[in-house]
Amino acid sequence: TQMTHQWSRREEQQLPYKIVESGPVQEVVEEEPNLYDLPLCLHSDGNNGKYITGGVLIAKHPDMPMMNASFNRCQLVAKDKLHVRMMPPQHLGIYYEMAEKQNKPLELAIVLGSSPAMMYSAASKIPIDRDELEFAGALSGEQMEVVRCKTIDVLVPANAEIVIEGKVLPNVREEEGPFGEFTDSYVPIMKNHAFQVTAITHRKDAFWHDIYAGGREDLNLLGLPIESEVFNHIRKFATPEDILD
């Protein structure tokens, strides 16, 4: 497809972001956050509570100035606390392991209402030494404007809708799940990570973006990077005449 060709052409590219002083996503700053004020959804009857599924999770590398972005399910457990599933080999899980070895929390922002380029970058499989905010710029062809979070040292898209700021606590695992996954089955209760919320910022007229696991949006987001990866492998062993869209 045309999108696959464009992805393959741009996946080696980076476009540096631009740090700005303020942006729409920080029009309102809630220093005493209450997650119960947000419209989290109960996606399946067997889920153990409400989840954030459409959030792009952005974290800074513990030792280097680069940002990772990914999708991870986040279970609501208190007005200022979420349980987050993030395990190696996913890059966010590796970031957490690095921070935990230093007995430090991992600063993390959950971004709702990102641009399509940011969301596709978060779903990508680019190497861990690449910055996914810069990759989002390469995908869109435009320099992304970012702002620094209010309570943590993480950069987020200035034009997003909502940002939940916080820290993933070291050496803490608590029960999360069950959760209905894209496989049309439930993952069981497991020990996962505790995310302590420190602030919420948002537009004055912010909207909430939700993704149903296994729905069309979910499969499109996850499918394009995989399709491109398969396409690139085929190109290594086939002539141009052998490849059909």
Could you describe each region identified by the protein language model?
Residues 1-194, 198-245:
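Extended, highly charged
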